[in-house]
Amino acid sequence: MCIRDRDYSVYDALQAGFGKIVFVIRKDFEDDFRKKVLSKYEGHVDVDVVFQSIDALPEGYTCPADRTKPWGTNHAILMGKDTITGPFAVINADDFYGRDAFRVIAGELSRTHDRKGDYCMVGFRVGNTMTENGSVSRGVCTVKDGNLDTVVERTAISFDKDHNIVFTDENGTQQQLQPNTPVSMNLWGFTPDYFEYSGREFRKFLDKNIDTPKSEFYIPSCVDTLVKSGEATVKVLDTDSRWFGVTYAEDRPGVVAKFAELHANGTYPAKLFQ
């Protein structure tokens, strides 16, 4: 995608009050990344780079010779444990989340956290994450007393002929989702104690899956474990931001037009970083 969603996320994060950006990349990409990406942020924000590699495992574990796939999104978070010292948000670099999403999570992270396991996530309204060009997969959330109760990955969410949002459940029955149903788009808020929990859960993951070449340690699965054990609560934050990206090639013209509109109406300057 020629549109750099990452640049918009960095810009929006700065506007929301975040003061440092930590990028998780492959070591072999470092030189190009510093020249082509980090250079544009100089003078605008404090940036750091950490490296995710398949050999970055806890003491006592050795990466299998046939492993080529990264260990997953929650393993990527663990790469920042020696760099991050305060509350932090986690995003997908190639997603566009919108200004309001960063505003609400920055507000939540800036309050006092006086206990471990006090986390948050932005719950996007599923109707604001859809495409007209096919189906999508989303982590559909149930919320209890303002906190995350469950998150279930639903595949093939789409519009039906009446433009209702539907998916087929595990029993083969078509179910309808209300447009304001919260879904996770991997915009999470944590405090540094999450590294401790993640390290423990990653070791458990490796004990079961280290010899499975395509197994991955995902953020939602780790969070779900902590919620079910009572070690964490995850406040679900509402946003009216519209997530968008190029899920299908047919999405591209609409996304390009939307970015042009956001520049034209003054949401973003002509150049984000100059």
Segment roles from a protein language model:
Residues 4-92, 97-104, 111:
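Conserved N-terminal catalytic core of the sugar/cofactor nucleotidyltransferase
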Residues 18, 85, 116-117, 231-232:
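Short, high-confidence coil segments that cap the C-terminus of an alpha-helix
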Residues 25, 92-93, 122-125, 190-191, ...:
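A secondary-structure boundary/capping signal
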Residues 47-49, 119-121, 234-236, 243:
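Conserved beta-strand scaffold positions in the cores of enzyme catalytic domains, especially
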Residues 54-59, 127-129, 157-159, 242-244:
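A short acidic, often aromatic-flanked loop/helix-cap motif at beta-alpha or helix-coil junctions
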Residues 58-70, 134-139, 250-254:
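Short, surface-exposed amphipathic charged segments that create phosphate/polyanion-binding patches used
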Residues 99-188:
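Conserved core of the sugar-phosphate nucleotidyltransferase
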Residues 144-145, 151, 159-274:
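Conserved alpha/beta core of the MobA/IspD/sugar-nucleotide pyrophosphorylase nucleotidyltransferase superfamily
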